[in-house]
Structures are given as structure tokens and as C-alpha cells.
Curated annotation (Swiss-Prot):
Subunit field text: Component of the large ribosomal subunit (LSU).
Matches recorded under SUPFAM superfamilies: Translational machinery components
One Pfam family here: Ribosomal_L18_c
Cellular localization per UniProt: Cytoplasm; Nucleus
GO molecular function annotation: 5S rRNA binding; structural constituent of ribosome
Keyword RNA-binding: yes
Full protein name: Large ribosomal subunit protein uL18
One GO term (biological process): translation
Region (Disordered): 258-277
The keyword RNA-binding belongs to this UniProt entry's keyword annotation: yes
Length: 297
């Protein structure tokens, strides 16, 4: 069939149908979303849960969500800006921080559902493949599916660090090792030690050492926040180990008391009826006093 020119006449515009708003804005991949939210018809009102992972310039958002007609509902959420309360105050968007955020979400969700004692996950971080096994007498493991949005799923991407943290935290997420750091596409082999180094931020530590040797000014400029907190390359692994232990000990978010800000009034308050009448009576009395004193002609 040859090339057919599209004739944009009255019939064309009359039948034209615009795409969904979020597709027009380039925010949602509906091809992937349809498959992520479509549940088996014999499961009726059982929602299909998604592990939603999104990255911004300064934060990581991890949510467990499910779809409804009126919109998505968030069951639980964890953010990288919560990590400072567990000791991680810098590098809140790297692979190690993504792992911590995923772990925090998993522990927070299981604690919310009362499953945190049954499904502890993997307490020893080795970087190897780990899958949650359901207990014999009790509820099954919480199953959800990774939702990466519009991110590129390249090998070693941070989104898989968040997923690995959630899996080690006790969530049941179908996955393989093909996209973790340490997987070699040519030999088809997975090096768990490389993955472990990324989880504990050793790739950052190696770069810190390299930059400190090559260019001291660039090192001080790029890692100024690390230097301010007294962190060097040797202290990074211990930092993340303590963070993992602290997250497991208490995943609940600390509630900060809101400061009371007294509301300012920029206009004068309206007088009551009694105040207005009193003001008029005082003015009359003052005027009569002046007349009696002969001050007014």
C-alpha cells in the first residue's frame, strides 16, 4: 500500500479523539499501566498492589499503591528525606539510599499490616538473590509488582536498588538478578559482591578516594557535605549498616510537633454596636463640654 496523505477536513476533526491527558503530557505509560493494574477476574475485589518508585533531584519516593476507579490509593509510603533520622544525612538519591528507602517502606508496611514479626526478610545483606518464603501456618507474604514509570530499566539502575531493599525487607516481589549491579550480560553471570558494594555505598567511597588523590579542590567541592559531617570513604559502609539496623528497629515515622504561628491581622477589627454607641456618646460629651466652656463660638 502506498503513502496515503491525511486529509484534515471537517470529517477528520469531527472524528478526532484526543489521547489521555497524562499521555499528552508524557507522564504515564498506559501500555505498562494497563498490565500493572489489571487483576484476574476470579479475584473480584482483591487489589493488585504496585511498588511505585520515583526519583527527583533531591528525593526518592517509594509507595505501595493500588488502583481504583476514582484514582490510585496509597497504602504506604516512604521517602529518602526520612533517612536523616536513621543517620543517613547525605547522598539521599544514590543506590545505597534507594536500598534504604525500599527497606524502610517494606518494614513500615509490614508493621502497619501486623506482618513484621512473621516476615523479617533478609537481615544479612550479601547482595545475593533473595525471595520471601510464605509461612506454613499464617497469612501469605505481601505480593506487589514493581512500577518504574518512565524510567529506563538499565542494568544497575537505582530503581532496582529500591526494589532490592523492599525484597530484603520482607515483601514478595517477582524479580531476577539480570538488572542488578554486578550482572555481566556477556557471560550471563551475577557477581553478588559488586551488588553488595553498591548497597553499602562503596562505589561512592571508591570515587571519593580517587578524586581526593587526583584533584583535592574538586573533592572538597563535590563532597563538601560529607566533609562537614566528618565522613570519609572508610566510614560510609558503617553508616549504612547502622541505618539498616535502625530502620528495622523502628520504621515508624517520627511525628514533629507543628509550630504555632499566630495569625496576623492587617486591618483594624470592626467595632461592635456598643463600642460605636459609646464612641458617639463620648464625642457628644466632649463637644458639650467645649460649648459650656465657651471654647466654641
Amino acid at each position: 500500500m502506498g503513502f496515503v496523505k491525511v486529509v484534515k477536513n471537517k470529517q477528520y476533526f469531527k472524528r478526532y479523539q484526543v489521547k489521555f491527558k497524562r499521555r499528552r503530557e508524557g507522564k504515564t505509560d498506559y501500555f505498562a499501566r494497563k498490565r500493572l493494574i489489571a487483576q484476574d477476574k476470579n479475584k473480584y475485589n482483591t487489589p493488585k498492589y504496585r511498588l511505585v518508585v520515583r526519583f527527583s533531584n533531591r528525593d526518592i519516593t517509594c509507595q505501595v499503591a493500588y488502583s481504583r476507579i476514582e484514582g490510585d490509593k496509597i497504602l504506604c509510603a516512604a521517602y529518602a528525606h526520612e533517612l536523616p533520622q536513621y543517620g543517613v544525612k547525605v547522598g539521599l538519591t544514590n543506590y545505597a539510599a534507594a536500598y534504604c528507602t525500599g527497606l524502610l517502606l517494606a518494614r513500615k508496611l509490614l508493621s502497619q499490616l501486623g506482618l513484621d514479626k512473621l516476615y523479617i526478610g533478609s537481615t544479612e545483606v550479601t547482595g545475593e538473590e533473595f525471595n520471601v518464603k510464605p509461612v506454613e501456618d499464617g497469612p501469605g507474604a505481601f505480593r506487589c509488582y514493581l512500577d518504574v514509570g518512565l524510567m529506563r530499566t538499565t542494568t544497575g539502575a537505582r530503581v532496582f536498588g529500591a526494589m532490592k531493599g523492599a525484597v530484603d525487607g520482607g515483601l514478595n516481589i517477582l524479580h531476577s538478578t539480570k538488572r542488578f549491579p554486578g550482572f555481566d550480560s556477556e557471560s550471563k553471570e551475577f557477581n553478588a559482591d559488586v551488588h553488595r558494594q553498591h548497597i553499602f555505598g562503596q562505589h561512592v567511597a571508591e570515587y571519593m578516594r580517587q578524586l581526593a588523590e587526583e584533584d583535592d579542590e574538586a573533592y572538597k567541592r563535590q563532597f563538601s557535605q560529607y566533609i562537614k559531617l566528618g565522613l570519609n570513604a572508610d566510614a560510609i559502609e558503617g553508616l549504612y549498616k547502622k541505618a539498616h539496623e535502625a530502620i528495622r528497629a523502628n520504621p515508624a515515622r517520627k511525628t514533629v510537633a507543628k509550630k504555632a504561628h499566630p495569625k496576623k491581622r492587617w486591618t483594624e477589627k470592626k467595632l461592635t454596636r456598643e463600642q460605636r454607641q459609646g464612641k458617639v456618646a463620648a464625642a457628644k460629651a466632649e463637644w458639650l463640654k467645649k460649648i459650656e466652656a465657651g471654647e466654641v463660638e
